[in-house]
Amino acid sequence: MPITIKSRSKGLRDTEIDLSKKPTLDDVLKKISANNHNISKYRIRLTYKKESKQVPVISESFFQEEADDSMEFFIKDLGPQISWRLVFFCEYLGPVLVHSLFYYLSTIPTVVDRWHSASSDYNPFLNRVAYFLILGHYGKRLFETLFVHQFSLATMPIFNLFKNCFHYWVLSGLISFGYFGYGFPFGNAKLFKYYSYLKLDDLSTLIGLFVLSELWNFYCHIKLRLWGDYQKKHGNAKIRVPLNQGIFNLFVAPNYTFEVWSWIWFTFVFKFNLFAVLFLTVSTAQMYAWAQKKNKKYHTRRAFLIPFVF
């Protein structure tokens, strides 16, 4: 029962496969690759036509259990790819490099004299605290990328890397302007008046809340990894099943929740620096959108940031 997989890209050739041999998805991709100068299988997007729509083939057993000779299949070259693990590593490495450079420059007296904002006092202690909080946050993320996270997709188009890195290299990198006194809209007297009202006028308390949020975030990532491993062990490698226990019953995506809280406490520590506020706002909006997609997907109405409220 041979069928022809038609090419939707100029650089790819049509490929014929025999469904009677019950090939796996990997077998089909390898045959397509061999028929097209051994192009990487991660560049190949394999779809079938369903009600005039192109539906991706992702199940390893699709050609064994669902495919038949009445279906139309297509392939498309996605272009050069990069692994998702490397994407995340590049994203998180950016702020480490940018902040390390600007923090180092902020410790050189001649550079400070030349470039520090005239409207803000030079505060090397605050700079050091902010820098090490940033370093700890992204150091944790790099560790998780290398040793904790699993990715549902192996690769993405390499040209998307620059778009993905913008958020971290640029928006997070802008916070480092604060080492030179830029972006502080409030004077200390006014700011600490409100901090005192909120019982948050102790720096060690704010740092402790930041660290606690980071630890909760790390815990959530470990739980998600263990849950993913459990699902794979029981044959569910593709369909995401929500974790329904503990803090995951309160929040739709508690890893996002504590990520946001970490940046809230950092923003308090860094005296509501406008660049930190911008990064917090953009990050929160994006994670809120992702969280609501999870609520919709799982048919839940769990909180995003505050239990039973929001």
From Swiss-Prot:
Keywords of the record: Endoplasmic reticulum, Fatty acid biosynthesis, Fatty acid metabolism, Lipid biosynthesis, Lipid metabolism, Membrane, NADP, Oxidoreductase, Transmembrane, Transmembrane helix
Protein location: Endoplasmic reticulum membrane
Enzyme Commission number: 1.3.1.93
Remaining remarks: Present with 23600 molecules/cell in log phase SD medium.
Protein species of origin: Saccharomyces cerevisiae (strain ATCC 204508 / S288c) (Baker's yeast)
Cross-referenced Pfam families: Steroid_dh (PF02544)
InterPro entries hit by this protein: 3-oxo-5_a-steroid_4-DH_C (IPR001104), SRD5A/TECR (IPR039357)
Role this protein plays: Catalyzes the last of the four reactions of the long-chain fatty acids elongation cycle. This endoplasmic reticulum-bound enzymatic process, allows the addition of 2 carbons to the chain of long- and very long-chain fatty acids/VLCFAs per cycle. This enzyme reduces the trans-2,3-enoyl-CoA fatty acid intermediate to an acyl-CoA that can be further elongated by entering a new cycle of elongation. Thereby, it participates in the production of VLCFAs of different chain lengths that are involved in multiple biological processes as precursors of membrane lipids and lipid mediators.
GO biological process, one term: very long-chain fatty acid biosynthetic process
Any single GO CC term annotated in Swiss-Prot or TrEMBL for this entry: endoplasmic reticulum
Assembly and oligomerization: Interacts with the fatty acid elongation system components ELO2 and ELO3. Interacts with NVJ1.
DNA repair found in the keyword field: no
Segments traversing the membrane: 86-106, 142-162, 166-186, 202-222, 243-265, 269-291
Catalytic activity: a very-long-chain 2,3-saturated fatty acyl-CoA + NADP(+) = a very-long-chain (2E)-enoyl-CoA + NADPH + H(+); octadecanoyl-CoA + NADP(+) = (2E)-octadecenoyl-CoA + NADPH + H(+); (2E)-eicosenoyl-CoA + NADPH + H(+) = eicosanoyl-CoA + NADP(+); (2E)-docosenoyl-CoA + NADPH + H(+) = docosanoyl-CoA + NADP(+)
GO-annotated molecular function: oxidoreductase activity; very-long-chain enoyl-CoA reductase activity
Topology term for the membrane: Multi-pass membrane protein
Primary location group: endoplasmic reticulum
Coiled-coil positions: none
Cytoplasmic side: 1-85, 163-165, 223-242, 292-310
Lumenal side: 107-141, 187-201, 266-268
Name this protein carries in UniProt: Very-long-chain enoyl-CoA reductase
Pathway(s) where this gene product acts: Lipid metabolism; fatty acid biosynthesis
UniProt similarity note: Belongs to the steroid 5-alpha reductase family.
